[in-house]
Amino acid sequence: CVQAMCDLYGVTHIVNTGVAGSLDAQIDIADLVVSTDALYYDVDVTPWGYEPGQLPGMDCLAFPADPALRVAIEHAAALAAPDVRVFAGRVVSGDQFSASSQAKERLAQEFGGMCCEMEGAAIAHACHVNGVPFAVVRAISDKADGSAEMTDPEFETSSAMRCAAVVEELCRAGL
């Protein structure tokens, strides 16, 4: 999707919203995390000299989010959802739902993740390759430790509405 948006529409920024599991004890369900960067946690080509999570041929381990866009999102969140706590940190992405406290600990310790999900690093990767500033915004849906039940539809709706309100506020600000 990001590549198509870059190729066909000449986008100037990408803001991706969704849900994630918290990897930090201070971050609770319904809090927001805005990316400082994004990293794949399921890439391992360490036998060839790469860092865990690093893609061969890439000039970085993690894909840095745009700092000005992150600040604008934090400001928009304060206006659109003043009751929601907002954290800035690393978003780690992989092909598995984090289902144990051991996996959670590994993602936090080895990769420095603040939250984990399944698509933010791919979006960040495409933005990085295309030189498009980006930020990933995640509403926390669970504690990423195996305690999560099926996501509550009411929570999904409220998370989507909260993220949409933040994006609307960004648009009002001219981004």
List the predicted regions and their residue ranges.
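Short acidic/His/Gly/Ser-rich catalytic and metal-binding motifs that mark active-site loops
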Residues: 43-44, 98-101, 143-147
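Short, well-ordered amphipathic alpha-helical segments that serve as non-catalytic structural scaffolds
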Residues: 1, 5, 71-76, 159-170
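His/Asp/Glu-rich mid-to-C-terminal helical/loop segments that flank catalytic regions of hydrolases
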Residues: 144-175
